[in-house]
């Protein structure tokens, strides 16, 4: 058993959320540095503003790319958007929604501002698209999934739900 099991976390292990948020908003990725570029893994882009791999600039660019993709492929249904409990989820949500709104995308988001697990977004997309051949929905989840608490993530879900 870990020696800290059942005990409050020591201050040195706690995340400095204001520092993280400042780095998210103020960070300017260097496009020459591959570690700071937008990089999609198995399910979206993940990284940390502390190393320049997840900043507002990343989210703005990814969100605009999603809008461009929707326009190019004729996706006109709603975009289901969810977030998790990671510290950067809410700042990244604001960045993403600004881009989606500026592009006239119909956004479906939890009305109470709550957290939305990834499978809920997938289910919403599949339920909405069932029996449709046009006006299909897709989705975004602001989450780094299982990554460390200082990370952020931006996942895109196609009209097939994943």
Segments from the language model and where they lie:
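Phosphate-binding chemistry for phosphorylated carbohydrates and sugar-nucleotides
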Residues: 11-14, 19, 23-26, 103-115, ...
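Metal-dependent DNA phosphodiester-chemistry modules and their immediately adjacent helices/loops
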Residues: 149-162
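An N-terminal, well-structured beta->alpha segment
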Residues: 1-98, 133
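N-terminal small/polar loop signature for handling phosphorylated ligands or for N-terminal nucleophile
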Residues: 72-150
